[in-house]
Amino acid sequence: MKRIAAMAWRTLRGSVQWRVLWLWHATFMVGVSGIVKDDEGRVLLLRHRLWPEHRQWGLPTGYAKRSETFEDTVSREVLEETGLTVRVRDLVNLESGYRLRVEVAYTADLIGGDINLDSFEVLEAQWFATDRLPEGLLESHRTLIQKTR
């Protein structure tokens, strides 16, 4: 039986094999966060409109689009949410084990731009010293920031 299954698999080839694998295995979203720092080492935090009121502060974050690199997701999300441009640097976190998502985080340096908020998603944006982070900061984001000090 295994031999027949292997022969059938080999006859499928390329894109058909990928479609079968996609249907057979878990599919998930990838949440991407950017730890954006300016020239003074301050970190960019956003007060997110759609997050629970007691923990609205967090890093710029969003979900990767199909065929988009995670680095491109960081750049896109920061630009969409704040109007700022960044240079994405290092992967600092990869977390799995969630039911429907994987989370990744990258460091990024501010390149330029003026803050122009996406008022649907973001209430405000501020730069914070890493030793003076606000109350209401998502705890997992606090941990990520501390990893990059």
Name each region found by the language model.
Residues A26, W51, L94-R99, S119:
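A short beta-turn/loop motif at secondary-structure boundaries
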Residues E95-N116, Q126:
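Active-site-adjacent beta-strand/loop module that shapes the phosphate/pyrophosphate-binding cleft
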Residues L117-T148:
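NUDIX/MutT-family hydrolases
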Residues L84-N93:
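A short coil-to-beta-strand element that immediately follows conserved catalytic motifs
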